[in-house]
């Protein structure tokens, strides 16, 4: 299930996403490491106003800082291959292992750089699969949601919504386009999230286009639990956080599954392999999961390409991660392990 977004290396300033705050209240929540981005924004603004005349129809796309594996990447790939006349640029850090994959397709800009700000301000439209996909989420949020700075932003999403998510309501985003993948989802978001007419569109997920062509490994099972808000925001020292996580029902249930003698016996009987890959928001605890059986691999998110795993796995075991939609789309079996 979809929840608060997070950078691949650090948590966003999620205090920004409270309801009905004034512009000045949001400003007080800007952290010291956000201050540099305020100066980047101020210095890039006048130049961007001129630069916009040179590139009137610039489309800027991005996802996470170091990744290109979701809907924004698949849209960028399509644009470069099928619609090269569109002036599309992708923002990604050179430190990401997907950097050269994107660079081979077209122009890239360093994520969070001054040039990223220049392009973000000058762009005709900013497109992302993440709500926080921008040079600096805190600064942009304060300016955009307060109405100080008006721009066009398209939200491609990275899953399918099944619940009311207040942080995605229009008054919390001011996004101009909100793409949905399923008819019931589209109707729910349109009627519940408060967007003006025609801002919510039934367009599908870009990454679904490739699902028609991928071939599964018949022996690979993906175990992919989603995250829990109460575990993501555990306070205290790392040691205290680990102890609280170890005592949680979440850890104990998933640990008991991957170490279950009955489960492992079935895996070996049918010659299967299991990859256990918790949601990125649980990755700080992934090292606490241990299984000595060679048929089970514990895969930290930073080592995983979740898109490849979705393509390769012949079966999914999850609680309610929205990637079950991908498996349903491919008509592959899904086993729900819920507690």
Language model feature labels by segment:
Residues 303-339:
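A donor-sugar binding/catalytic signature common to diverse glycosyltransferases
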Residues 138-159, 239-252, 331-339:
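A short, gly/pro- and small-residue-rich
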Residues 113, 280, 300-308:
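Conserved active-site histidine-acidic residue motif and adjacent donor-binding/catalytic loop
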Residues 70-76, 80, 206-288:
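Conserved catalytic-core segment of nucleotide-activated headgroup transferases in glycan assembly
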Residues 92-98, 279-283, 321-322:
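Short, polar loop motifs at secondary-structure junctions
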Residues 1-58, 63-65:
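Membrane-proximal basic amphipathic "stem/tether" segments
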Residues 57-211:
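Active-site and donor-binding regions of nucleotide-sugar-utilizing enzymes
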Residues 287-302:
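Nucleotide-activated donor-binding/catalytic signature segment of Leloir-type glycosyltransferases, i.e.
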């Amino acid at each position: 299930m979809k929840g608060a977004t997070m950078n691949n290396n650090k948590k966003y300033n999620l205090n920004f996403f409270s309801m009905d705050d004034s512009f000045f209240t949001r400003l007080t929540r800007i952290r010291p490491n956000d201050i540099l981005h305020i100066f980047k924004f101020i210095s890039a603004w006048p130049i961007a106003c001129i630069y916009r005349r040179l590139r009137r129809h610039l489309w800027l796309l991005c996802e996470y800082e170091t990744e290109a594996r979701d809907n924004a990447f698949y849209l960028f790939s399509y644009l470069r291959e099928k619609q090269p006349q569109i002036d599309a640029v992708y923002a990604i850090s050179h430190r990401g292992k997907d950097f050269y994959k994107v660079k081979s397709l077209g122009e890239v800009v360093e994520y969070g750089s001054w040039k990223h700000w220049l392009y973000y301000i000058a762009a005709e439209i900013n497109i992302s699969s993440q709500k926080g996909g921008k040079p600096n989420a805190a600064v942009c949020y304060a300016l955009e949601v307060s109405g100080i700075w008006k721009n066009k932003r398209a939200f491609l999403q990275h899953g399918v919504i099944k619940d009311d998510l207040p942080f995605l309501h229009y008054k919390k985003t001011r996004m101009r386009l909100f793409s949905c993948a399923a008819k019931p989802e589209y109707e729910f978001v349109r009627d519940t999230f408060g967007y003006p007419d025609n801002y919510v569109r039934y367009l599908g997920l870009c990454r679904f286009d490739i699902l028609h062509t991928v071939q599964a490994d018949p022996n690979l099972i993906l175990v992919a639990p989603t995250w829990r808000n109460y575990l993501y925001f555990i306070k205290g020292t790392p040691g205290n956080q680990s102890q609280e996580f170890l005592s949680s029902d979440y850890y104990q249930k998933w640990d008991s599954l991957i170490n279950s003698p009955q489960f492992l016996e079935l895996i070996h009987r049918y010659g299967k392999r299991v990859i256990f890959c918790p949601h990125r928001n649980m990755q700080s605890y992934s090292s606490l999961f241990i299984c000595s059986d060679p048929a089970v691999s514990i895969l930290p998110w930073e080592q995983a390409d979740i898109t490849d795993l979705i393509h390769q796995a012949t079966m999914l075991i999850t609680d309610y991660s929205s990637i079950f939609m991908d498996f349903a789309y491919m008509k592959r079996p899904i086993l729900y392990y819920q507690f």
